[in-house]
Amino acid sequence: MMSFQKIYSPTQLANAMKLVRQQNGWTQSELAKKIGIKQATISNFENNPDNTTLTTFFKILQSLELSMTLCDAKNASPESTEQQNLEW
């Protein structure tokens, strides 16, 4: 089972998901075909995630057999809040 650090930006999220795709040995084309979207859409997500729709994001997330957990930011440590500010 793969474990990730906390993610604070769309770029970090896209990089983590790209890593999972690569570790599964899938090309962008193979993943795109699996979920019925264009390879260019996968490329756009991995390289410019700020412009990806939530629908596309969740299709990719599901196809990689990943899930997302939300955490209460009020309980974040000062260090994680500082990291979040750096990422955005």
UniProtKB/Swiss-Prot annotation:
Annotation: DNA-binding region: 21-47
Activity regulation info: Degraded by Lon protease; degradation is inhibited in a HipA-HipB complex and when bound to the operator consensus sequence dsDNA.
Domain (HTH cro/C1-type) ranges: 17-71
InterPro entries in UniProt: Cro/C1-type_HTH (IPR001387), Lambda_DNA-bd_dom_sf (IPR010982)
Cellular component aspect of the GO annotation: protein-DNA complex; toxin-antitoxin complex
GO terms of biological process kind: DNA-templated transcription; negative regulation of DNA-templated transcription; regulation of DNA-templated transcription; regulation of growth
Top-level taxon: Bacteria
Record keywords, A-Z: DNA-binding, Repressor, Toxin-antitoxin system, Transcription, Transcription regulation
A GO molecular-function annotation: DNA-binding transcription repressor activity
Record note on disruption phenotype: Cannot be disrupted, suggesting it is a functional antitoxin; no visible phenotype when the hipBA operon is deleted. A hipA or a hipB-hipA operon deletion show decreased biofilm production in the absence of antibiotics.
Ranges in a coiled coil: none
Function comment: Antitoxin component of a type II toxin-antitoxin (TA) system. Neutralizes the toxic effect of cognate toxin HipA. Also neutralizes the toxic effect of non-cognate toxin YjjJ. Binds to operator sites with the consensus sequence 5-'TATCCN(8)GGATA-3' to repress the hipBA operon promoter; binding of HipB(2) to DNA induces a 70 degree bend. This forces HipA dimerization, which blocks HipA's active site and thus its toxic action. May play a role in biofilm formation.
Name of protein: Antitoxin HipB
Organism listed in the record: Escherichia coli (strain K12)
